[in-house]
UniProtKB/Swiss-Prot annotation:
Organism, as annotated: Rhodopseudomonas palustris (strain BisB18)
Keyword set, alphabetical order: Ribonucleoprotein, Ribosomal protein
Protein name: Small ribosomal subunit protein bS21
Family: Belongs to the bacterial ribosomal protein bS21 family.
InterPro entries on file: Ribosomal_bS21, Ribosomal_bS21_CS, Ribosomal_bS21_sf
């Protein structure tokens, strides 16, 4: 695997190399080959991965068809003491368990 180093910018080249390795699945492969995996464990892991993929695909399909609500986008910018989307009753005693 090769990456070009432009203008002696090693940090950028390392970042590009890491991205390529991630895309190729090298890190995952290294993790899997770090120790011996019994054939029965491998079979169970692959089966679980297939189930996970199928569920994810079905969830995405339902979201596209509008039968399942989309994941809420994270809200940024609510700093310390700011309104964090708790509605009009935000403040004293408005926690999830009521007043303490």
């Amino acid at each position: 695997m090769q990456v070009l180093v432009r203008d002696n910018n090693v940090d950028q080249a390392l970042k590009a190399l890491k991205k390529k390795m991630q895309r190729e699945g090298i890190f995952r492969e290294m993790k899997l080959r770090g120790h011996y995996e019994k054939p029965s464990e491998k079979k169970a892991r692959e089966k679980a991965e297939a189930v996970r993929r199928a569920r994810k695909l079905a969830r995405k399909k339902l979201q596209r068809e509008g039968l399942l609500p989309m994941k809420p986008k994270p809200v940024f910018g609510a700093g310390p003491g700011g309104d964090r989307g708790r509605g009009p009753a935000a403040g004293a005693g408005a926690g999830p368990r009521g007043p303490r």
